[in-house]
Amino acid sequence: MNLISKISPQNRILNRARLIAEEVLKKEEEYEHFSDQELINKSDDIIEYLANNNPLDDKLVEALCIIREVIYRVHNKRAFKVQIIGAIIVYFGDFAEMMTGEGKTLTLVLVAYLNALYKKGVHMVTVNEYLVKVGAEFATPVLNFLNMSVGQITANMNEYEKRNNYNCDITYTTNSELGFDYLRDNMVTNYANKVQRGLWFAIVDEGDSVLIDEARTPLIISGEPQEEIGNYVKADRFVKTLYPQDFTLDPESQSVALTESGVEKAQKFFNTKNYYNFENSDIIHKVTNALRANFTFFNGREYIVKKDDDGEDIIALVDQSTGRIMEGRSYSAGLQQAIQAKEQIKIEPENLTVATITYQSLFRLYKKLAAVSGTAITEAEEFLNIYNMVVVTIPTNKPIKRIDHPDYVFDNKRTKWKYVIADVIRRHENGQPILIGTASVEDSEILHQLLERVNIPHEVLNAKNHAREAEIIACAGEYKAVTIATNMAGRGTDIKLSPESLEAGGLCVIGTERSDSRRIDNQLRGRAGRQGDIGESRFFISMEDTLFSRFATDNLAKADDKLSEDVISTKFFTRLLNNTQKKVESLNYDTRKNLIDYDHVLSNQRELIYKQRDKILISSDNKDILYRMLDSVIDDLIYQSHNKPNEDIIDIKKLIDLATQNIFYDNYLNQDEYYGLKFEQIKTKLKKDCINFFEQKEQLMTPTIFNQILSEIMISNIDEEWTKHLDITSKIREGVNLRAYEQKAPLNIYVEDSDKLFEKLKHNVAWKTVCSIGKINYVHQDYSDLNSEFIVNDNEINENNNSIDFENFNESIPTDQTIQESFDDNQSDNEDDKNNN
């Protein structure tokens, strides 16, 4: 992509937004003279206009004038031109890059109102519950003024509270709670228990953090533990016996593998002749995780060990881009257990994944998606290619006065820390507030100890002390304040400077290490110089920093003659730093792109499964689905009853025996009626007998109860087979790169295997459902456990490969409108139940 193609769309979008914003500003005086009721009436008129399928574009200026005036009347804040421009860009579904302190909270209320006019629900997504609370508290009085409702979602809410809040015109929520609620909604066994009403429009605050930094970490809901823990300890003990020559470690990809000598040791340790034999797949899996846990994951960097509420040591994951603890999250596929074994703390059994989704897949489900952040332009290509959003940099309301000093580069960390402390002492004596950014919890603790030695009072904000995040950052601009923060740097919380701090030079941001992304560094710099304030930034870097040790080892030799114990700042190192960061950014983008290529396969299957569940839960008569499943089962029974596979000659006795064993059980099926029939007549006759048999079951009860039992059986079978599918496909994906002998691209292998497994899933659901219906004898009981083991050759089923359309399932899948109408009906029922109670 050349420079012109990158810039032109941004300029075009920005110019369009600027023209609209200027029209809004021209009408300021006109709207000042409207009464409160007149503004409300105008807003209601637009809602009615849109309800008649008219576009908002024709009323966009009027809508912006209304909400701008209401914000002023409620909060005494008048939206600046740049805030209006940002709102317009987000309204059209693009990514607005707005610098820190430019008023994103107000901008988001503008655009939330614009989309709420459609009355379809707007999700305002941010990274933590503090920002949810701040955003909702600012928006609520404004939108209530216009008779719109605002909700907020927190993790401790019950189902009823969440449903009411999601049913508001605008709902503030965290990205994690949004994702988990989506997964939980697609695990319900009663449609009325869903809490979300659909995914129409999402605005993602801190969009780069959610859509880029967290893209590789899937949301996972786990089921019951599936295996013993002893093998994790054994694998960890083995790895701790290895010498450097027994394994290889690639610093760039952080991949680690056994060498030939390591494999020989593994064979002796685990008493096996061939380490790579298929029967050793579990050993290989656990040893691989133990290698990663011991050599690429470190306490204080990727995770910390902390106490839980019961005083037990636990592993808490650290978000690499923010430094925050990722509450409630754990590594999957056994890596969490490997780290627990390494740290010699209680090992939790590995749980089976019952539902999972990545943020990439989640947000691509929305009909309309937009985002806002202070830093995004360096990832513009990725946002366009993956999310179809153009990143547009919004001009600041006031010129930026921050001075970004050249980097200081040192040979080693010891010298770097010496100069950092010297700089802090000098600035602190002058009263200048200082924010020091570190790349890890470990570095923040080192700096804390060094500052204590020189008696400089300071605050520390890292994953061990994140509870006071907003409070610590809010005070970071006070006179003589010194604040140490990991990469989180209090995103979403303004650092306001006192008059004394401004006189002392404004906030100085000191970076103690370059991250692997220019965007993360820009986030740290951007804490200073907000809204035209003065400020400074400088990075102190050593050749021992992670960025160099992992990604620039080939270039370090060239730097030897340019370094000494003294500070160095040269064009050579600036170029080396920038090139290294670009290299890492490219690697990370390729990783995320690869992730979405793989995830696209599972995403399509997930969507089909979830829509089929909705169809079953909504429908009052699921026999049409049962009969399509029956068609597939009958085809398989007939296929196995052929005397010769390539001929239409059927062994009637074998067919009747199989049908009796799997469907009719002790009920009599007259095989004499089948003799003399042609191939297609046999199929028709068997289906008719099965349907008659099922109808006899239905006559033992009401149609409603029969459908309820049928639904329970179908949902239970779908969920059970989907869980197995997730487990198997995840293991295939983990090992697909080792299958080079097939001479196919790993992705192609994964697609082929996953498609075959999904066909098997559909066959298993069909067989289990049809066989279970045959077992029904009506009593009041839970039929979800009524799963039958079918007595057929599973390999023959797969060879026959008669695809169940969850095929024509496409014909029966409900539309979004149908789902919404059902949601509304169930919502009314829930309200009635609540009122009656």
Swiss-Prot record:
Subunit structure: Monomer and homodimer. Part of the essential Sec protein translocation apparatus which comprises SecA, SecYEG and auxiliary proteins SecDF. Other proteins may also be involved.
EC number of this enzyme: 7.4.2.8
Protein family according to the UniProt entry: Belongs to the SecA family.
GO biological process: intracellular protein transmembrane transport; protein import; protein targeting; protein transport by the Sec complex
Residue sites binding ATP per the record: 83, 101-105, 494
PROSITE patterns per UniProt: SECA (PS01312), SECA_MOTOR_DEAD (PS51196)
GO cellular component terms, A-Z: cell envelope Sec protein transport complex; cytosol; plasma membrane
Membrane topology annotation: Peripheral membrane protein
One term of GO molecular function: ATP binding
Reactions performed catalytically: ATP + H2O + cellular proteinSide 1 = ADP + phosphate + cellular proteinSide 2
Protein function: Part of the Sec protein translocase complex. Interacts with the SecYEG preprotein conducting channel. Has a central role in coupling the hydrolysis of ATP to the transfer of proteins into and across the cell membrane, serving as an ATP-driven molecular motor driving the stepwise translocation of polypeptide chains across the membrane.
Protein's cellular compartments: Cell membrane; Cytoplasm
This protein's name: Protein translocase subunit SecA
UniProt entry keywords in alphabetical sequence: ATP-binding, Cell membrane, Cytoplasm, Membrane, Nucleotide-binding, Protein transport, Translocase, Translocation, Transport
First-listed, main subcellular location of the protein, grouped into a coarse class: membrane
Superkingdom of origin organism: Bacteria
Broad class of enzyme this protein falls into: translocase
CDD domains xrefs: DEXDc_SecA, SF2_C_secA
Entries under Gene3D superfamilies matching the protein: Helical scaffold and wing domains of SecA (1.10.3060.10), P-loop containing nucleotide triphosphate hydrolases (3.40.50.300), SecA, preprotein cross-linking domain (3.90.1440.10)
Native organism: Ureaplasma parvum serovar 3 (strain ATCC 700970)
